[in-house]
């Protein structure tokens, strides 16, 4: 498996925080700031994992997750959003193909614990 990650969030410091964590784990990290960028970047770099915010401009993260899952049934997507506290968003995330969910804000241990679920 390649160790390439795509971090998708419209907030730059969140992308940086996740990027730092994943680079420590040996991942090459690419970034996107909205769902449309995420889809284009996914097609270009074929990441092994994707972290995805929900509420973003241009395209909602759940829609982008669904498009990515349609492109690649084996996609490993983790939703990182304050929205996952709401059961309906978690349900929609699962329907869109997400395999792990993390509520913001989070620390590195919480992130890695949830991230590991992508590989179960």
PLM segments and residue spans:
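Receiver (REC) domain active-site loop signature in two-component systems and cognate sites
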Residues: 56
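Active-site residues of response regulator receiver
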Residues: 53
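Alpha4 helix (beta4-alpha4-beta5 surface) of REC/receiver domains from two-component response regulators
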Residues: 63, 84-102, 113
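Conserved phosphotransfer cores of two-component systems
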Residues: 43-45, 67-75, 96
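Hydrophobic/aromatic residues positioned on beta-strands within the core alpha/beta folds
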Residues: 80-81
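Two-component/phosphorelay signaling modules centered on CheY-like receiver
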Residues: 12-30, 96
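C-terminal output helix
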Residues: 106-115, 119
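Acidic catalytic/metal-coordinating carboxylates
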Residues: 34-37, 60-63
């Amino acid at each position: 498996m390649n160790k390439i990650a795509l971090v998708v969030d419209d907030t730059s410091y969140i992308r940086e925080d996740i990027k730092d964590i994943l680079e420590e784990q040996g991942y090459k990290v690419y970034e996107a700031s909205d769902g449309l960028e995420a889809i284009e970047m996914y097609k270009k770099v074929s990441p092994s994992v994707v972290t995805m915010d929900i509420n973003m401009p241009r395209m909602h993260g759940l829609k982008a997750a669904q498009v990515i899952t349609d492109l690649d049934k084996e996609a490993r997507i983790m939703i990182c959003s304050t929205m996952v506290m709401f059961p309906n968003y978690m349900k929609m995330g699962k329907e869109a193909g997400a395999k792990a969910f993390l509520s913001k804000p989070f620390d590195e241990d919480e992130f890695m614990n949830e991230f590991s679920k992508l590989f179960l």
